[in-house]
Amino acid sequence: MRIRVAAVATVLLTLAAQSFAAYKISVWVPPWNANALTSIQLNGGAITESNPIWYSWNADYSIAKEWNSENPTWRSSMSGLLMPTVQNAVNGSFDGNASAAMLATAATRDAHANALTQLAVSNGYDGVDIDYERVPTASRANFTTFVNGLAAKLHAANKKLSVTVYAKAGDNENWNGPGSQDWIAIGGAADSVKIMAYDYHWSTSAAGAIAPLDWLDQVATYAEKTIPGSKIMMGLPWYGYDWPATGGASNASFASAHQTMLTNNAALQRDAASGEPYFSYSGHTVYFQDAAGYAKKIDLLKQKHGGIGGFAHWAAGVEDPDIWKVISGTPVTPPPPPPVTPPSSGSGGTPVQSDFLVSGPTTMTVMQGGSVSGDFQLVPVNGFTGTASVAVAKTFSGTAVPGISMIAAGSAVKIYVTATAAPGTYTMTVSFTSGATTHQQSVTVTITPNTARHRAAKR
C-alpha cells in the first residue's frame, strides 16, 4: 500500500459532538455474531436504543426464542432503551405466507399482538421492534390494522413500538414487502419507524453501492412527507458485499473486506455517488462501509433532513470501529506530528538529502474480541516529496500470537483480536519505506481480558 505525502490516507471527520446529541442512535445486535457483544460493550455510551435480534416465529405465529435472549451478559450489555427485534422468520427465513395467514383474521391478529405485548411486559423490555418482511401487498390493510392494535396494547402497558420497514421513495413500489407497508398509518401508530435504507444493490444484483446518496435523499424526502419527523429512524448499512463474476454475493464486514483487499493486493477506490469504498480482485467486486463513507451519509441526511429522529444501523459487530468516533464527534485524525528540525547543511553549503519521519501512536489498547486502529503519518524532512509503502510486523515481540491480525491500509493500521487471544503486552512495529530508506516506529499493544465471556452462537 503506497501513500503520497501530499495526500496521506487519513480522513478528517469533523462532525461535532453536539450535532449528534439531537439524534437517537439505535443498533440492531445480531447474537450470532460474536463481535456484536464486544461492539456494544465498548460503545454503549453512544447508543440510545438496542435492538437485539432475540425472537422469531413458530409455525403457529407464537413467539420463538432465539440466541442469547435469556443470557444475562447480553442483557446487561445493552444500552439505552431495550427493544428486542421480533422477526417474522419461521425456520430461519422470513415467511410472508405465514404473515398473511396471521393477519387474515381479527382473532389471530389479536392473539399475536397480545403475545408481543406480554413479551415486553413479562421481560421488562421498554418495548419491541417488529421486523416483518416479505408480507404480501394484498395484506396491506390487515397489516395496518394489526399495527394499530399492537400499538394500542403496548401503549396501554406503557411500552413502545418500533416498526422496521423497507426503504422506498414513493408509495408506488407494490412488490411484496414495501407494498404492504402504509407509512402514513404506521407512522401515526408507532413510536418510531426504522427505514432499511440499504440494499440498493443486493446480494443477487449487479455489484454497486449499497446506499447511494441520491437514493437516501429520495427515501428521506418521502419519509418526511408521510411520517412525523421525530419518529423517522434512517437505517444505514455497516456491512458490505463481495460479488463474484457470476452468482450471488457473500457478506463482507469492514474487517473481512480489508483482509481480502490486502491479501489480493487490490487498489482501494471510493464511489463518488455513495462515498462507499470498493475494490476489485480476481473477477470479484467488493463494496463495504467505512467511517468516511458513513460520515458522507450522515452529512447529507443532517444537512437536508435535519428534522428526522435519528439513525438505525445494521449491524453491530461488522462495522469500522472508527464509525463510533463519527457518532461521538471525535475527529478521526492522526495525532499531531512532532516538531521537526531539518539537519544543517554539509560543508561548503551542500544540502543534505531529504528524508522523512514516522509519526503515530506509541501505545494502543484493545479488549479480547475487539479491534483498535491507529493512524500513522509520514512527516517530510528537508523537502521530501516521494512516496512510501507502509507495512506492519506480523509478529508481536518476535513471536506469532494466535488470534491477532494486523492490517495496514493507507496510513491506518488496524488490529483485530479474537475472543481467545491471550491478554498481555506486546510490541508492534510499523515501517515506512521509500526506496532504500526505511523508518520504523514501535508501538506497545496491550490486550485486556474480556470479562463478559459468552457462548458464541452462529446463525
Please describe what each predicted stretch is.
Residues 16-17:
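N-terminal signal peptide c-region/cleavage motif recognized by signal peptidases
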Residues 85-99, 231-300, 331-337:
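Glycan-binding loop/region signatures in secreted carbohydrate-active enzymes
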Residues 22-115:
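Glycan-recognition patch characteristic of GH18 chitinases/ENGases
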Residues 50, 130, 193, 234, ...:
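Conserved, mostly hydrophobic/aromatic
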